[in-house]
């Protein structure tokens, strides 16, 4: 009887002897079988889209309109809401039907992809080169690889333009900076200036500079997508029409495993960027849907207690705290009026609920005394009690109530998951890059399976 460990197991007509890989190496057995590898990739896409559709419908089924999205552990509906679907002024959900439609469309798409995956895995030709030369390829064919890269870039460019079209012509996006607490807004005047758009890329990633994570208006977001979408389409056409230059042919390793390593490195970078975006940014990740950022929760607590104590008669401009610094207000290193207390570390925070109270020199005392609106008080109190924290100390002064409701912010989920997965993908990038470079140099054929201990063990039965 065959077991999973005796090396003779044949899955889909491919065994360890003929492919050089054991059954558990998965798609490595299909490296030179373009048709079967297509099936694996299409089936994988089907699984991804199925998860998106099923999870989408799961969130719709459990959604409670009276509660904020971030209090319900949702991660997909906030993305749809950010795109302007189903929400109105203040980020209030007015219609869940678009969310239902999104889930159903993804499920239907996953069925098509699933069928295609099964077909190409089990029925379709093992290799595409003979029957469908356009879709066929050989990993070492540098010109074909360049063409495939170009096709991918064109598709990605159209993806970026889809957001632009949604923002400008198909209903707009949710803009948390709209007056009165955010609203869906058509972006009519996106930022085209290369100085502004590429200025983000040249900024420091640290502190208040924040690289591209510091984007704080929808015009720049849409303008950035116009630029990157256009560049990707033009770059894709370039790669389709041209052949790699001599320096590129020499510089890169041209093998399936090398391309895998490049892809893993790119996905890793995107995961780390997504981690920082979801944790720090409250423009493209509106706090109305994802909950406050860490600095936002801390600042909102200082604001909430300033409002309370001012009503009780405190002079918030001159009251001293236990350290001798201002209890409610103090000055930043650059002389601006900022909130006092531990939240001073977040003095450069910017948020839609707070900005109306600023003047030319930081927070405006006159506005703090006379112009605070009820919606600002409500939002700050809500954000204060929903900090994205998993820590008992060093939380920027936010009260950590051990008997509070068990709340985990979607920002915590998204940032932590993308950081961990980004790290794993980076390790995978290093692993496969090392193997690919070694194979290209001719001194590495992978781990020697002939001396695998399990091969000398007797069958389990």
Swiss-Prot record:
The protein's name: Photosystem II CP43 reaction center protein
Locations listed in the record: Plastid, Chloroplast thylakoid membrane
Keywords, ordered alphabetically: Acetylation, Chlorophyll, Chloroplast, Chromophore, Manganese, Membrane, Metal-binding, Phosphoprotein, Photosynthesis, Photosystem II, Plastid, Thylakoid, Transmembrane, Transmembrane helix
Residues reported to bind [CaMn4O5] cluster: 355
Gene it is expressed from: psbC
Keyword Acetylation attributed: yes
Similarity annotation: Belongs to the PsbB/PsbC family. PsbC subfamily.
Membrane topology: Multi-pass membrane protein
Domain of life: Eukaryota
Propeptide: 1-2
GO term, biological process aspect, one: photosynthetic electron transport in photosystem II
Role summary: One of the components of the core complex of photosystem II (PSII). It binds chlorophyll and helps catalyze the primary light-induced photochemical processes of PSII. PSII is a light-driven water:plastoquinone oxidoreductase, using light energy to abstract electrons from H(2)O, generating O(2) and a proton gradient subsequently used for ATP formation.
Residue ranges crossing the lipid bilayer per the database entry: 57-81, 122-143, 166-188, 243-263, 279-300, 435-459
KW Disulfide bond (keyword) present: no
Cross-referenced SUPFAM superfamilies: Photosystem II antenna protein-like (SSF161077)
């Amino acid at each position: 009887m065959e077991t999973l460990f005796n090396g003779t197991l044949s899955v889909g007509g491919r065994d360890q002897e003929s492919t050089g890989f054991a059954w558990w190496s998965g798609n490595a057995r299909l490296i030179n079988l373009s048709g079967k590898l297509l099936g694996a990739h299409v089936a994988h896409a089907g699984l991804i889209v199925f998860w998106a559709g099923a999870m989408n419908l799961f969130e719709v089924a459990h959604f409670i309109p009276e509660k904020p999205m971030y209090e319900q552990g949702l991660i997909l509906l906030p993305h749809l809401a950010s795109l302007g679907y189903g929400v109105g002024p203040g980020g209030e959900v007015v219609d869940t039907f678009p969310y239902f439609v999104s889930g159903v469309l993804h499920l239907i798409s996953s069925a098509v992809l699933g069928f295609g995956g099964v077909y190409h895995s089990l029925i379709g030709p093992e290799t595409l080169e003979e029957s469908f030369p356009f879709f066929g390829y050989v990993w070492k064919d540098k010109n074909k690889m360049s063409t495939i890269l170009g096709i991918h870039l064109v598709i990605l460019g159209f993806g970026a333009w889809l957001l632009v079209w949604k923002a400008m012509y198909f209903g707009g996006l949710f803009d948390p900076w709209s007056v009165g607490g955010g609203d869906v807004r058509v972006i009519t005047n996106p930022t085209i200036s290369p100085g502004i758009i590429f200025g983000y890329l040249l900024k420091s990633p640290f502190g208040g500079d924040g690289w591209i994570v510091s984007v704080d208006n929808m015009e720049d977001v849409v303008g950035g997508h116009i630029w990157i979408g256009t560049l990707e389409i033009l770059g894709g056409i370039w790669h389709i029409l041209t052949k790699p230059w001599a320096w590129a042919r020499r510089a890169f390793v041209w093998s399936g495993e090398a391309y895998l390593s490049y892809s893993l490195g790119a996905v890793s970078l995107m995961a780390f960027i997504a981690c920082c975006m979801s944790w720090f940014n409250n423009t493209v990740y509106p706090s109305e849907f994802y909950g406050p950022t860490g600095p936002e929760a801390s600042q909102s607590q200082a604001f909430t207690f300033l409002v309370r104590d001012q009503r009780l008669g405190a002079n918030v401009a001159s009251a001293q705290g236990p350290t001798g610094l201002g209890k409610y207000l103090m000055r930043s290193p650059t002389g601006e009026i900022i909130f006092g207390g531990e939240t001073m570390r977040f003095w450069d925070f910017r948020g839609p609920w707070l900005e109306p109270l600023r003047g030319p020199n930081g927070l405006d005392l006159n506005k703090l005394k006379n112009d605070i609106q009820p919606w600002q008080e409500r939002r700050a109190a809500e954000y204060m009690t929903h900090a994205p924290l998993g820590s008992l100390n060093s939380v920027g002064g936010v009260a950590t109530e051990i008997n509070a409701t068990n709340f985990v912010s979607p920002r915590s989920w998204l940032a932590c998951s993308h950081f961990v997965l980004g790290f794993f993908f980076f390790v995978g990038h290093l692993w496969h890059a090392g193997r690919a470079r070694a194979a290209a140099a001719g001194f590495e054929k992978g781990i020697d399976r002939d001396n695998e201990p399990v091969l000398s063990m007797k069958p389990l039965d």
